[in-house]
Amino acid sequence: MDEDAGARGTRASGPSLTGSTPNQTSLSPDSVAAAPQRARLHAMGLTSAQMARPFVGVVTSWNEASPGNIALARQAQAVKRGVRDAGGTPREFTTIGGSDSGVSGISSLISRDLIADSIEAMVRAHGYAALVGLAGCGTSLAAMMMAMARLDLPSVIMFGGAALPGRYLDRDITLQDVYEAVGAHAAGTISDDDLRAIETAACPSAGAGAGQFSANTMASVSEAIGLAVPGSAGLPAPYDARDDFAHKAGLTVMDLLDRDIRPRDILTGQAFENAASIVAASGGAACAALHLPAIAHECGIDFDLTAIGYVWRRTPRLADLRPGGTFLVRDLHDAGGTPALMRAMLNAGALHGSCLTVTGNSIAENLQQVEVPTGHDVIRSSDQQADRFRVRLYVLQGNLAPDGAVMTGDDMVSQRFLGRARCFDSEAAACAVVAHCGYEEGDVFVIRHQGPKGGPGMLSVGAVAAALSG
């Protein structure tokens, strides 16, 4: 990749709720004025020795609203052990976190900004010296990276992990198959019992969607952009080894604090290109086109849709992952995980290897001992017909979308398509037509008013496409 977009994020730019973060040294036993604050900490069991150590915020979006968030509390305890082992005092707190596929349109994108604001407010209010964030969906991962960039304190992001796939009729299934089954049921090709069997089998474990959907896309971004411990993004949520990565995240944030390595040292222009590149290489979700500019804005970096489209056009598709491909995140993990994919990208010239990461080393240094395993079809090298993988991401511009639009779909052999437009003002209206098979082959579904203002909140309408596929 070109080595011409590496401007470092400025620590002075980016929005902020308050002024500078309070200094934790005010808790020193020598400070008479801090006695009330120390008394409150004693009430929670902290000793004077613990108060003298750096306070590290450990924020999770744990809740009982979605399977992607349910395993975060357990992993947070391992993060806290790592912080303690490295000489810090962890302070856990939570923020909100909806599921991108389980909320109304008014909640999803708005929640991203609320999460970022709430983390900033909490960290500044309590003067934490560093931050570890654990998130279980694409929106909360983006929000935590936004907050880290805004605060510019030593920080590590950690994904809670993908779910394992279910099994039905001797094949792996995911939530995507449930959406498709809804369409198949409407078409009369499967029975009520079939639909119920798919529904109950599709999600057998905690974790985000088992394919390269929004959560796993942003998890891959967190690793490629340099804010996550290498290898942590692709490990499924139920695996005990996630606790080992969580412990390492706690150790890592303390090392960053000792070395004064901050997010804006890592989040350069080239780092954002790496993030966009892994989205294309993995066949990831288009939501990255919403989140990457927002994270870059917190760093004072302009990384817009045009820049993302430029990276996508030059990046080969190297991983055959669902929803557009064949394999699941578990299969990617078995094939070497995100590091193996990044190694294939580096070999293909699709990564800036010199970018700094939370290890204190560059991406190329992190990947020095990583090899792309052979004997599987999950990851391909750039000379193994990688472009045969069907689904790609495109940024389009024209009279329908003067400011740009994002499209996912098969490689566009033809630049022309003619069909009848079926226009709807809500996802529910479109789903009703699908449910009654009120469409014909060649129809184009247009669902209006679903953007940040119209939805409001940028509702995902993937259920309609999946039902049509079914």
What are these language model-derived features?
Residues R8-R11:
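Basic polycationic patches enriched in arginine
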Residues V123-M144, V156-F159:
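A short, small-residue-rich loop immediately preceding and capping a beta-strand
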Residues I115:
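Active-site glycine-rich loop that binds ribose-phosphate moieties when present
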